[in-house]
Amino acid sequence: MTEPPKICQETPPIAIWGGFLLMCLGMFMAILDIQVVATSLPTIQGALHISPEAMSWIQTAYLIAEVIAIPLTGLFTRVLGLRWLFAAAVSLFTLASIGCAFSGSLSTLLVFRVVQGFSGGVVIPAVFSAVFLLFPPRLHAIATTIGGAVAVLAPTIGPVVGGFITETWSWPWLFLINVIPGLIVAVLTPRLVPRQPTDLAELIKLDSLALLLMVLALAGLEIGLKQAPHQGWLSPACAGQLLASGLGIGIFVLRTLRSAHPIVRLAALQQRSFAVGCALSFCLGVGLYGSVYLMPVFLSFVRRHDAFEIGTIMLVTGTAQLLAAPFAAILESRFGARALTAAGFALFALGLGLSSFQPRTADSAEMFWPQVLRGVAIMFCLLPPTRIALGALPEKEIADASALFNLMRNFGGAIGIALIDTILYGRVAIHADDFRARLLAGDLNAAQAIGLDPSLLANRPAGPPTAEEIAFVRPMVEKASLALCVNEAWAMLAGVAILGLLLALLAREQRN
């Protein structure tokens, strides 16, 4: 085991800043990859002749591997040190990207997606660990702002990047764009980031049973959340799987708390600030990933925009995030984290809530200000909670705590998307039946709501609708019903943001 000099210095050299920026680039690659692939799944499906049911596993395989890797980041950091862990993870991610690009079958693609997800899952918490390991407290706000801006910008611009690549080039380039930046990050990061203690003996003391429990429980939970909206949350198969996953996580936690050499150090959860910070990270995950998922649903299926147009409209959120980032850094270094977090979630709830009133005909103009509010708010929902969660922890707990903090954001996203799908799949038919009944009763307001000229309904002869009339009205009813469900989903996300506001009040005030 090597004993390097203390990393965190009062005046970090330029090399450390360069290394940190390269780490942020690696994190940007990993997060962006999820979104660009999600945007282009139909293209990959057609190229590899994959069924629609199997297509979703291209994303699910990545997400399962990622959620397993995130809590292991602390262990990997203790074994390899920060710089070599990051270099190894980015190298593996780059090689897996090449493998994905040249995959000729679904099975081959899934194998490389698992490798991508596992290596990418290590990268994200490692960056937030670096904020507190490489820099003194007075620079935490600036470093957190840089890392946070990158983390939330990537999902926002992902759709436009994915749409541009699939329309301009071909689907393998969704993965090949990672190669050059991946090589740069893998080669230069270990040269710029200082040494840390390493302890290969951690692998010898590894609790293999706890590791198996964690892998099975997290994978089962991710799959259960994916299937719940389709099969029903209370269906025997889905409910059983979610219950088994929850039981597995409970047993893992009990075993880990009693272990002399835990895989994941959970001691930080005993501190109120860290526990509240994790809850805030969960709420942000619901709103952040939920909104990035929900906007394309509306713009694609209701407004009929293509992938590139959707990405262009969503750039408003990313632009607002970038413009808000320096102000967030200034305020974050001068004011208490609790007050800024509460303000951020209040603004986030407002931006989400405004979208819940958008009409069926809403487009880029109507979506502009809600996007601006959300983009500004997201920076204050990420940066101050990071300081609340990690700012007061001892250095030896940072890596594991950062992993748990980021894991909660990912879980929030998974649960948020599952709840959105539950609303969309479960409520569309209800609204459609209501529209049909109102139209048959001659309700002119219903005609106007679905975009049908009320005079056509008013002047229609009495009697049951003809096949031609049903065919003409059906797509209007479907779009209007989906638009109502989207608004209900926005309202649900706003409710979670309000919960984040209330949780922020429980945090202990911290100032730099």
Name each model feature, range by range.
Residues T39, L63, I70-A210, P236:
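Helix-loop-helix hairpins in multi-pass membrane proteins, especially solute transporters
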Residues I14-F86, S97, S107-L110, V150, ...:
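Transmembrane core module of solute transporters
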Residues V179-P197, L216-K226, S245-R258, L503-R508:
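C-terminal membrane-cytosol helix-exit motif in multi-pass small-molecule transporters
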Residues M1-P12:
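Short, Lys/Arg-rich, polar N-terminal cytosolic tail immediately upstream
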Residues I146-P159, M367-G451:
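Small-residue-rich alpha-helical segments with characteristic i,i+4
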Residues A54, L139-I146, E309, E397-L404, ...:
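Cytoplasmic loop-to-transmembrane helix junctions
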